[in-house]
Amino acid sequence: MVLKIYGAAHSTCTRRVLTVLAEKNAEYELIPVNLSKNEQASAAFRVKQPFGKVPVLDDEGFLVYESRAICRYLARKYAGQGTRLIPDEGDVRGWGLFEQVSLFLREGRVG
């Protein structure tokens, strides 16, 4: 079954997930969510994402939301294919640096 990504192609968070999928050479289907029509706030969408945000990953019925969580899930699921995006499990220094940069970028500081 092909992964389904519910999101908006112009959304930064959706694009983050699509970038990871491209780096991992993973097949997926983008299910468009029209943010200008507020589709993410609908009762049907909130079954998938209770906060009404995009993106949402559907992996054979297993739903993951929050773009960074989706990206980590995909990086581990497809660890053996495409670009290596996260450190190995036992690489303590690698994880420390990874988290440091992740937190730094999340706060929006670039210099």
List the predicted regions and their residue ranges.
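GST-like domain detector, emphasizing the conserved glutathione-binding G-site
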Residues: 1-111
